[in-house]
């Protein structure tokens, strides 16, 4: 049985709940167990995964990053998006960990809601499927 850590950014609560719902629905249909930790914003996701990887207290087979960044009127959106993607990539490449990336970047809340809804784009569910496939691949290539 695979163990997965879901790191869920709760900055946009409604979107966070939809992402998590889609991910959990997908994981319940698999042979995986999961823990969920909430972080204040999407920017904190890479550090939280790194904390778990380096802690030695937990033994997760894969990680699921869920969050949302919505474009505003300043450059903040670009910096957060870049920081999150680069941070996740760095952790994945350095520690060779399976990851499902369910971080939505959208121009509006309405577009983000469509992507998060499990009955529409289901980004959370797709990210969960990805981490499960990456865990299988990781195990095959060990």
Swiss-Prot record:
Q: Name one Pfam family in it.
A: DMRL_synthase
Example GO CC term: the record gives: cytosol
The catalytic activity, as recorded, is: (2S)-2-hydroxy-3-oxobutyl phosphate + 5-amino-6-(D-ribitylamino)uracil = 6,7-dimethyl-8-(1-D-ribityl)lumazine + phosphate + 2 H2O + H(+)
Please give the pathway this protein is involved in: Cofactor biosynthesis; riboflavin biosynthesis; riboflavin from 2-hydroxy-3-oxobutyl phosphate and 5-amino-6-(D-ribitylamino)uracil: step 1/2
Q: Which InterPro entries match?
A: LS, LS/RS, LS/RS_sf
Keyword Signal attributed? no
Q: Which domain of life is it from?
A: Bacteria
Task: Write out the residues that bind (2S)-2-hydroxy-3-oxobutyl phosphate.
Answer: 73-74, 115
Q: What does this protein do?
A: Catalyzes the formation of 6,7-dimethyl-8-ribityllumazine by condensation of 5-amino-6-(D-ribitylamino)uracil with 3,4-dihydroxy-2-butanone 4-phosphate. This is the penultimate step in the biosynthesis of riboflavin.
Q: Please give the family membership noted in the entry.
A: Belongs to the DMRL synthase family.
Q: Protein name, please?
A: 6,7-dimethyl-8-ribityllumazine synthase
Q: Which gene encodes it?
A: ribH
């Amino acid at each position: 049985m695979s163990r997965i850590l879901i790191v869920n950014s709760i900055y946009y609560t409604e979107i966070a709940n939809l992402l998590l719902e889609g991910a959990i629905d997908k994981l319940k249909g698999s042979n995986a167990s999961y823990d969920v930790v909430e972080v204040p914003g999407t920017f904190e996701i890479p550090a939280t995964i790194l904390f778990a990887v380096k802690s030695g207290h937990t033994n997760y087979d894969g990680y699921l990053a869920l969050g949302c960044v919505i474009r505003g009127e300043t450059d903040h959106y670009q910096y957060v998006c870049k920081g999150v993607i680069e941070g996740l990539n760095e952790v994945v490449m350095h520690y060779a960990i399976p990851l499902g990336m369910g971080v939505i970047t959208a121009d509006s809340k309405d577009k983000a809601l469509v992507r998060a809804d499990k009955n529409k784009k289901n980004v959370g569910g797709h990210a969960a499927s990805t981490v499960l496939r990456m865990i299988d691949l990781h195990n095959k290539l060990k």
